[in-house]
Amino acid sequence: MQSISLTALAEEQLTLARQARSGRAARTIHGGHEHALRQTVLALLSGHELAEHDSPGEATLQVLRGHVRLTTARDAWEGTVGDGVTIPPERHALAAVEDSVVLLTVVTPRPPGLS
């Protein structure tokens, strides 16, 4: 069993985001190309965003710190610490209303050869 402190990782990623010109930093804590499930801790500084992009598959977003806004062409959701949302299977963007950290969980089709 592997465990991690999401609180400590959130602080680490916020520190890295503050040093990055993009105003963001991320670390995958589970998954990758060999797994169907992927979890990523993503820090975004206030006023920065992940521009509109296609949905990577079935996904959820949980706010670990701060305040974020998830938008699609037809809808918008705002979340703060402890809030979560199922990301719709359409193009969307994520913006930080204040310095924020989220846990993004994505399920993608299993690669060939994995069962």
Predicted features by range, described:
Residues 1-36, 71:
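A short, N-terminal "cap"/entry segment at the start of jelly-roll beta-barrel domains
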Residues 23-26, 38-55, 89:
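Conserved short histidine dyad/triad with adjacent acidic residue
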Residues 48-50, 66-71, 92:
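Short beta-strand segments in beta-sandwich/barrel cores
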Residues 57-73:
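Glycine- and acidic-residue-biased ligand/ion/polar-headgroup-sensing regions
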Residues 64-65, 80-81, 98:
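A cytosolic small-molecule/anion-sensing beta-strand core signal
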Residues 73-89:
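Short acidic-glycine-tyrosine-enriched beta hairpin
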Residues 89-113:
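Ligand-binding loop in jelly-roll beta-barrel domains
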